[in-house]
Structure formats: C-alpha cells, structure tokens
Regions:
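Acidic/polar, glycine-enriched structural segments that form the non-catalytic walls/loops
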Residues: 2-350
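Carboxylate/His-rich catalytic cores and anion/metal-binding grooves
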Residues: 314-322, 363-376
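Segments forming glycine/polar-rich beta-alpha architectures that bind adenosine-containing cofactors
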Residues: 348-354, 359-360, 365
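Short, surface-exposed helix-loop/turn micro-motifs enriched in polar/charged residues
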Residues: 338, 354, 374-375
C-alpha cells in the first residue's frame, strides 16, 4: 500500500512544518492559505523567493470573463469562462540585510518554521539568515474585512550591527496561470505616494462580453521601528522604502498594513479611493498591532465557539476537521449576500473560483448550523 506523503506535522490546531519544501513549495502554499471571506491569499512568502511558486491574491466577487480556447467542433461551448482572477501582490517586500537582498530559494537559511494557526486565523514563519532572526506574522482581519496585516520581526543573533532595508511594494504585474491567452487582466488607473504610505488603483481590462469592469484600490501604511527613506512609483507598482540599523542584542519590528477596497462597494474610482482612505484613517492608522491582532483572535474565537468539533485520541483527524472548517469560514461566512462558497477558497485558481451546485448542496446545511441565519 502506498504511504501518505506528509509534508506538514500533525497538530490539533496548526498546520506547521520546520522544513522549507523546495520541491513541494506550491503544496505548502496551498495548505497555508488564509482569508476572511472578503479576500485572501496563498501562503506565499512576502520576501523574494526565486524558486517555483504560485503567487496568488484573490478578492471575492472580483472576476474576469476569460475567452475560451476551443476547437471548431465544440458547438454550443460557452464564449468565456468566468474566473476569480489573481488581483495584486499586496504582501511583497524586498528585504536587504547589509545591502544584500534575501532570496529564500537561494540563501542558506536555518531554523525555518512555518505555522498556520487555525484557532487565531494567523500565518507565521521564521528563519535565521546572515546573523539575523527574521519572524513574520500575517492575518486577514475578521474584524475589518478590507485589512491585511503583515508584521516582521528582526532579532540580532551575533555581536555585529546589521543594516536592515525593506522596500514594501504593491505590485499589479501579476498573471493567472490558467489564463487562456496569457493575458494580464489588470490595468493601472492611478497611483500615488502619500505621507502615510502609497496606493495603487487598478481595473480589470475591457472585455467583449458586456461584463462589468472591477476597480480595486490597495493602499499600504506602516508602523514599527523603521525610518522612512524614500518612495517611488513605477508603471505597475508603488514602493515605500524603510531602513534602520539592528544593533547587537536588540530586536526591531516592521509592520505593513494593507487596505483593499473595490467597486463592488463604491460607485466609481474616486469613491473607491476615498473609501479606502477613510478605513485607513478611522480603523487602521491609530491602532496598535496588539489591538488589531486581538480583534482578530476574538472574532475567530466566536466562530470556533459555535463550530469546533473535538476529536479525542486522534490528532490527525482533529487537525483535518479543523482545517476543513477553517478554510470554509475563511472562504465564506455569510456577511455579504452577493457572494457564495468558492470550492477552493482562496487557495488558488482551480475551477476559476466559481461556485458549483454540489458545493452549495452539501455546504449550506453546515453554514445554517454554524453561522448566522442570514448566511443563506
């Protein structure tokens, strides 16, 4: 009998590993995807990773009608396939230690850790490189649905001072791996560097099928111990650069907070930008990390209070049932009646992110029992 290939450790509440799986990196990314029903992403590193990977960030209800590729014999075949498309790379940073960029696929790293905490809805990873311990933690807020938080910690491991430089990027130069004609589905409408950070406004490209074009605005603001150095805009990206010296026996924190708004909730580009700015000023900029984090933990605790299934004496089964519930609730929790249950959640592009009748038929009873009645 074939043995199960297990790349993640068994733990009742976590999907975790102490190995960076170069050969199975895509699988690791799928297993550590997170979301909040409004948006989500695969478990990609924020830092540069030049190895094989599938970068993916998705917004629920934001899609594009990709023209089908089909031979002449397929009479009656649909003209397009609706896809929940890869939106922006909002997690991206270029991390330099002592003027050399960190590439996790190339650099010799040690003490690697990776953990999706399903109880709290957070993903964390860490590693040692060039005399520095790097610790990353992220979550897609279950309290402020438009907010994703990325925190990076740096701890000196030797008696040397290290210069840490971080270029934080929002990048629209993204693709869908399953695009039928290798098209990029996004065009940039607007971009700006501001006192608190930067924003990038994009729109899905025009299509010949009369389907609406979606506008998406992503902004980044920052907190922590780093000094702002410079800002830049490029054709398809915005960048904010921060840096400081990490002294021996000390530690530093850098926070990247991303707010994403779309034309699903606002009338036009100006309104999407204004709505984004309002969320940043009213709900994000003055909040300490611990406040944002605690709101996340509290929101997920309420979900688990209703939904948790306890299995004694079988940790693998316990992990499995919680993983399924976590991914379901990360995908859809009923807050937006316009949305539905994507069969693969925010783990990637399989099935185009569309919902199928069998997903509905089998999942609705679960949601009726474990979420608010308005879920349907």
């Amino acid at each position: 009998m074939n043995q199960i290939k297990r790349i993640m450790a068994i733990d009742p509440w976590k999907i975790k590993s102490d190995t960076l799986e170069i050969e199975d990196r895509r699988l690791q990314e799928s297993l550590t995807a997170i979301g909040n029903g409004y948006m989500g992403m695969r478990g990609n590193f924020s830092e540069t990773y030049s190895g094989d990977s599938h970068q993916g960030f998705y917004l629920a209800g934001v899609w594009y009608p990709d023209k089908t590729r089909v031979g002449w014999w397929k009479n009656g075949y649909p003209e397009y396939f609706g896809k929940a498309i890869n939106a922006l790379n909002i997690a991206k940073i270029n991390l330099n230690i002592d003027e050399v960029e960190v590439d996790l696929a190339v650099d010799p790293i040690s003490n690697f850790t990776l953990a999706l905490d399903m109880q709290k809805g957070t993903l964390s990873y860490g590693y040692d490189v060039r005399g520095v311990r790097v610790s990353a933690e992220r979550f897609f807020s279950a309290d402020v649905r438009e907010l994703a938080v990325f925190k990076f910690g740096f701890e000196a491991l030797d008696d040397q001072a290290h210069y840490i430089r971080i270029a934080s990027v929002i990048d629209a130069d993204v693709k869908n791996e399953d695009a039928n004609y290798d098209e990029q589905f996004w065009q940039v409408l607007d971009q700006a560097n501001q006192s608190q950070g930067s924003y990038l406004a994009t729109q899905t490209i025009a299509n010949p099928f009369g389907i609406e074009q979606f506008t998406v605005v992503a902004s980044q603001s920052f907190a922590g111990d780093f000094e702002g150095l410079e800002q830049a805009t490029a054709e398809r990206s915005v960048t904010d650069v921060y840096g400081t010296v990490l002294k021996p026996e000390t530690s530093l924190i850098f926070e990247k907070r991303v707010v994403v708004t779309t034309s699903r909730d606002y009338a036009d580009l100006a309104a999407v930008i204004a709505g984004n700015a309002a969320i940043v000023s009213e709900k994000v900029i003055d909040q300490a990390y611990q406040q944002l984090y605690q709101a996340q933990v509290t929101a997920w605790a309420k979900r688990w209070e209703l939904a948790d299934v306890v299995i004694e004496g079988a940790d693998a089964a316990q992990q499995g049932i919680r993983f399924n519930l976590f991914q379901l609730f990360s995908t859809y929790y009923g807050e937006d009646e316009r949305l539905n249950i994507g069969p693969k959640g925010f783990t990637g592009e399989k099935y185009g992110g569309a919902t199928y009748w069998d997903t509905e038929a089998y999942a609705v009873p679960l949601y009726l029992s474990l979420a608010d009645q308005q879920v349907t």
